[in-house]
Regions:
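Helix-to-loop junction immediately C-terminal to a conserved catalytic motif
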Residues: 51, 310
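Q-loop/switch helix immediately C-terminal to the Walker
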Residues: 93, 100-114, 337, 344-360
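Conserved ABC nucleotide-binding domain
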Residues: 129-144, 369-385
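C-terminal boundary and immediately downstream tail of ABC-type ATPase nucleotide-binding domains
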Residues: 132-134, 230-265, 453-460
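Hydrophobic anchor residue at the start of the ABC signature
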Residues: 156, 184, 397
């Protein structure tokens, strides 16, 4: 039987360095293959090479065959003709994949009309699809009105309505709570009834539930390859063992430091979005140096509460009292979607220079933070769209901490990171904020991780 996807000795490089070492694999109908590894290991570059959409400045060697024909034998128009109908992609950044000026329902309906040519049934099929992912009341929303998890599910619908025989899912469960994650996993498993599934993830549990074959990568090099159950039950490489052991269940509890004076008091607030009540009767106090966790399902209002604490929104009722005014630039937010929060037209070095100039920050702090966040200085010469999502996440952390904030709200700060990097990065955020007495609000759908690191956890 001809493989739907055949990769032969594929390597990816820049003019200066090799990013992905030579690797080979095949994927047949009704098979699942998961590429598992840390951020920056070349997983997404592999997907781009298969699609035929490598970023500028990168080149590939080796051969890639889709549906029995080598990609280099196809014209660009012939490659693009596969997109959507034969080869579907669920991208890592859902907000980038969605049209910002189209409502969510319209974008899914457009797939039925333009790609499938099914005008008459597009509305009914779209309604059914949104009900399938528990978003039937959100079709009229624009992408910016969706939470990260909701946007992820809409992007999934756009990618899968054509029922393409080959689906590439890049971090498909990133930012989702456990119940939504399991729902998406079940939908991805349904792909195997009509074709093949290539999944890119750093989530051990996702890899385990999808089964099939696993390739473990680190820094562009294959560490281990084999059946999922065998690799995860009896890992051979030290890296695979470390990846499995980095689950939050095994994290040590962070020692609780002393807190200072109250920074803000939340008094009986409520927040409504149209007819929907996100939360009500919410009261608590946040003190200087305190670590407060906020957990809850996707779309429950976690990010909205963060914006209320920062003064970016006003509550529908109640009030937030700030005994002492926080200076401009000292109440900051680490956004859930760093690629959307960072300018794409300039280098990361320029972004840091802007912060240093605007807030009179010592540039001498940059090398130390780069080292502590495990970021290469070479990254600073690149633009935001030229680095991995996880590296960009850590860069956003560096940029925020440069200003020594009084209040830092971190919205899903480790959602793009593999377990090893997530554990060390979260611990580093805590250490660095505690060193300067900064109040830290951690937003996450991973309640266990919050319970291991926070003074208190608020569940919405």
């Amino acid at each position: 039987m001809t493989a739907l996807l055949s990769v032969q000795q594929l390597a990816i490089s820049t003019a200066q360095e090799t990013l992905v070492e030579s690797l080979s694999f095949e994927l047949h109908a009704h098979q699942a293959l998961t590429i598992l590894g840390e951020t920056g290991s070349g997983k997404s570059l592999l997907a781009n090479a298969i699609i035929g959409n490598l970023p500028a400045g990168l080149r590939s060697q080796g051969k890639i065959a889709l549906f029995g024909q080598y990609q280099h034998q196809r014209t660009q128009a012939e490659r693009e003709a596969l997109w959507g109908k034969q080869l579907a992609v669920l991208p890592q950044e859902p907000w980038h994949a969605l049209n910002p000026i189209m409502r969510a329902g319209e974008q899914v309906a457009e797939v039925h009309r333009l790609v499938m040519g099914n005008h008459a049934a597009s509305a009914a099929l779209t309604n059914s699809a949104f009900q399938q992912v528990a978003l039937h009341q959100d079709q009229s929303k624009y992408p910016h009105q969706l939470s990260g998890g909701m946007a992820q599910r809409v992007a999934y619908l756009c990618a899968t309505q054509t029922q393409a025989p080959l689906l590439i899912a890049d971090e498909p469960t990133k930012g989702l709570d456990a119940s939504r994650r399991d729902q998406i996993i079940a939908l991805l498993q349904a792909q195997l009834t009509r074709g093949a599934l290539l999944t890119i993830t750093h989530d051990i549990e996702v890899a385990e539930k999808l089964g099939g074959t696993i390739i473990v990568m680190r820094k562009g090099v294959i560490q281990e390859q084999g059946p999922a159950q065998q690799v995860l039950s009896h890992p051979q490489s030290d890296y695979t063992k470390a990846l499995i052991n980095a689950d939050p269940r095994y994290w040590p509890t962070t020692p609780q430091s002393k807190t200072g004076e109250p920074l803000l008091t939340v008094d009986n607030i409520a927040m409504h979005r149209g007819e929907k009540c996100l939360f009500d009767s919410l009261s608590f106090t946040l003190s200087a140096g305190e670590i407060l966790g906020i957990s809850g399902d996707s779309g429950c209002g976690k990010s909205t509460l963060a914006d209320l604490l920062l003064g970016l929104l006003k509550p529908s009722q109640g009030r937030i009292h700030r005994p002492q005014a926080i200076p401009v630039g000292k109440a900051l937010k680490l956004y859930q979607d760093p690629p959307s929060a960072l300018a794409k037209s300039v280098t990361l070095q320029t972004l840091l220079e802007d912060v240093c100039r605007q807030h009179t920050v010592e540039r001498s702090h940059i090398p130390r933070l780069l080292e502590r966040l495990a970021l290469s200085p070479n990254l600073l010469s690149r633009k935001a769209n030229q680095v991995s999502g996880g590296e960009l996440q850590r860069f956003a952390i560096l940029r925020a901490l440069l200003t020594r904030p009084t209040l830092l709200v971190a919205d899903e700060p480790t959602s793009r990171l593999d377990p090893i990097t997530a554990a060390s990065t979260l611990q580093l955020i805590i250490e660095l904020t505690q060193e300067i007495g900064c109040a830290l609000v951690l937003i996450s759908h991973d309640k266990l991780a919050l319970e291991k690191t926070c003074h208190r956890v608020l569940s919405l």
